[in-house]
């Protein structure tokens, strides 16, 4: 999991390869941000480069997509982080990923971009992936996809020192048939909505990796913008409360226990659905423990 290459901080063209195709004013704004932030945070940029030239196994994460280095300049998972806190969060995330997942699994993830954690149904699988949606929300994700490789639901995460697993985003599909995809997935998952299945996946991963599981507060989320707040339909604070989260120490603390109803307490017409759901969760837990 090593490379002889010497990593250097990417140029503007490397970080924004498609900038020339954008409107002129947008190019100007991007250039001003890039050069301004690079000068302002030159110390943190240099320290990130030093880290990657020491921990060379992680260089490919950034050379695969140079835009991921933009996280040191602007936002990484938690908008409250200062530049020095972003640096710590980025480097500790990678250090803890290797500690928790193991060196060989990290290399496999970098090479393949995704690893199937479990086959949920004949059509749906849960995978551990490199996050390709937005690095500002983390470098890693777990996601549910169907046999057509359509993204049903995705959730990015990061490790926080000393021992936290932070869920940094939850996103549904953006395609024209998004509602139908989610509806079909909920039915296939025996009545469990995909976003809640992802949280269950995180609970099992946190248990395996022996981490405390936490959720990002709404206003600290990587994509939160004051100007766009009226357009945000998903509220993270409300979602974590639906998952029995308690706000403590700047994050939503989430329990690892997955609640189950006693089958005898369930209406007879729904008993079969719940039995199949619990069998699916049991197999999922077994597969994740064997990761």
From Swiss-Prot:
The GO annotation for biological process reads:
DNA damage response
Q: Which domain of life, per UniProt?
A: Bacteria
> What protein is this chain from?
Uncharacterized protein HI_0461
């Amino acid at each position: 999991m090593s490379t002889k290459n010497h990593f250097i901080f990417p140029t503007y063209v490397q970080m924004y390869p498609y900038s020339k195709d954008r409107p002129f004013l947008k190019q100007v704004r991007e250039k001003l941000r890039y050069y301004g932030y690079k000068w302002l945070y030159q110390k943190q940029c240099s320290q990130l480069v030093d880290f990657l030239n020491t921990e060379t196994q992680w260089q490919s994460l950034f050379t695969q997509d140079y835009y991921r280095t933009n996280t040191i300049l602007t936002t990484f998972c938690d908008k409250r982080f200062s530049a020095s806190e972003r640096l710590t969060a980025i480097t500790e995330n990678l250090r803890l990923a290797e500690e928790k997942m193991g060196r060989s699994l990290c290399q496999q993830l970098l090479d393949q971009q995704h690893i199937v954690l479990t086959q949920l149904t004949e059509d749906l699988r849960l995978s551990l992936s490199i996050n390709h949606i937005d690095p500002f929300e983390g470098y890693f994700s777990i996601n549910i996809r169907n046999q057509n490789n359509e993204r049903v639901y995705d959730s990015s995460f990061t490790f926080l020192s000393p021992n936290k697993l932070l869920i940094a985003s939850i996103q549904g599909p953006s395609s024209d048939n998004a509602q139908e995809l989610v509806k079909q997935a909920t039915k296939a998952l025996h009545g469990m909505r995909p976003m809640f299945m992802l949280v269950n996946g995180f609970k099992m991963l946190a248990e395996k990796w022996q981490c405390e599981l936490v959720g990002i507060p709404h206003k600290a989320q990587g994509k939160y913008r004051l100007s766009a707040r009226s357009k945000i339909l998903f509220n993270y604070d409300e979602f974590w409360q639906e998952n029995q989260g308690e706000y403590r120490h700047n994050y939503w603390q989430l329990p690892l226990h997955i609640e189950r109803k006693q089958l005898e307490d369930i209406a007879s017409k729904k008993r079969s659905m719940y039995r199949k759901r619990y069998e699916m969760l049991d197999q999922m837990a077994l597969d994740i423990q064997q990761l």
